[in-house]
From Swiss-Prot:
Lineage: Bacteria, Thermotogati, Deinococcota, Deinococci, Thermales
CDD domains, alphabetized: NDPk_I (cd04413)
Keywords, comma-separated and alphabetical: ATP-binding, Cytoplasm, Kinase, Magnesium, Metal-binding, Nucleotide metabolism, Nucleotide-binding, Phosphoprotein, Transferase
Catalytically driven reaction(s): a 2'-deoxyribonucleoside 5'-diphosphate + ATP = a 2'-deoxyribonucleoside 5'-triphosphate + ADP; a ribonucleoside 5'-diphosphate + ATP = a ribonucleoside 5'-triphosphate + ADP
Cofactor(s) the protein needs: Mg(2+)
Compartments, as annotated in UniProt: Cytoplasm
Protein encoded by which gene: ndk
Protein's name in the database: Nucleoside diphosphate kinase
Amino acid sequence: MERTFVMIKPDGVRRGLVGEILARFERKGFRIAALKLMQISQELAERHYAEHREKPFFPGLVRFITSGPVVAMVLEGPGVVAEVRKMMGATHPKDALPGTIRGDFATTIDENVIHGSATLEDAQREIALFFRPEELL
């Protein structure tokens, strides 16, 4: 069964959006295979966003993602990677359609509520970064 990694970012947790976001995924029929509230360390943030290391926004991204707790989860279901990407909406909230998570809740490109794996390969890498095998049900 296909799995993806999803993270509700500090702005989403701070604004009390966790329940609504989880409900959207559950209504879509996805199974939660793992879930935890956590504080991301500087090292984990840098590993997670390693592909952006040389970009000018990298320090701010790491600072933001470590600024408060996040909810990390693994969702499972047919076509879950692509479907979650569609449900999240465009990265920039001004481009995100109403009815998508970012379209409904994101305020800026920097604080856009949620992260989801872009590909199956990314999902496998991100799941392994955030969860030990025994944490996956």
